[in-house]
Amino acid sequence: LLFRNVAIALVAAGFIFTGSASPAKAWNCVQFVHQVSAVKLSGDAWRWWSAALGRYERGKQPERKAVLVFDHTSRMVHGHVAIVADLVNKRIIQIDHANWSIGRFGRGQIARNVRVQDVSEKNDWTSVEVWNELDQCWGRPYKALGFIYAR
């Protein structure tokens, strides 16, 4: 009986953390975006911008289901990609992405409806900040290369 209760608790924990009845999977951002997006690219996240040339439309304005491409940095050597989930206003969007921060549940977790704000001087989404839910504040500015549209 104890074993059955522990097994049920573990399955429930997997459901709570992942939104499904399967155990939590550790994702990187590229795996996640490739899985949920119509944009089918691979390799380092920051390289998606150039890889999309000639295959997908690219631009500087967010749209639902577009892929936001973050440039690489010394701390984020592979860059980052995320899916635009919703448009809040001209300067704020919500994204779904994976493996952004360690947070409460460890690396590789999927975060949904995370706010991102455009902090670029020209309002062209070349510099963005990501909302840190745990600390309830905006993070540091990151260079964004743009949006890839699945069309």
Language-model-detected regions and their locations in the chain:
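Aromatic- and glycine-rich peptidoglycan recognition patches
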Residues: N89-R151
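Secreted/periplasmic proteins that engage bacterial cell-wall peptidoglycan
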Residues: A24-V88
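Bacterial N-terminal signal peptides that target proteins for export
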Residues: L1-L10
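C-terminal segment of classical bacterial N-terminal signal peptides
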Residues: G14-P23
